[in-house]
Amino acid sequence: MAGPEIAENHRNDAYVYLYDIFPTLCEKVGIDTPSSVDGKSFAKLLDGEHGEKFRDELYLIFDNFVRGVKDDNYKLIEYRNGDKEEDKWTFLYDIKNDPWETVNLATDESYKDKVNEMRERILNHRDEWEEQAHPWGKDFWTRF
């Protein structure tokens, strides 16, 4: 982002969502964010502050066939494009050591616990966002 009172030539790798932009703009112009709005302001990040971590991870959703979670070290993607086993894929990447995501670790037995732990985090996000009440979410989770 660029504009008055926003630090220039500054990069920050904090995890933010698109829905965080509106609360950020509200804070920058000095108005309260309506209570009905999801998201949180990342104005301090725009000011160049590097204090506490903004978010520990991102919950990833694409349409009704992809769910995932990404943190500083790993990304787990669950892809469901149908009801048959051949339509279901799991991808685990060590993004610290493999930033281009070229080696899928999901089938490596030594990463089984990591896959299960990250799946549990996906389920927590699903419940937090009440995804099964939404048609796309319901469609994905019936195939999970």
Predicted regions, residues:
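Intrinsically disordered, low-complexity regulatory regions of eukaryotic regulatory proteins
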Residues: 36, 54, 96-99
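Substrate-binding rim/cap in mid-to-C-terminal beta-strand-loop elements of soluble/periplasmic
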Residues: 1-36, 40-52
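C-terminal, low-complexity/hydrophilic appendages and adjacent surface loops
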Residues: 10, 14, 60-107, 116, ...
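WW-domain-binding short linear motifs
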Residues: 53-60
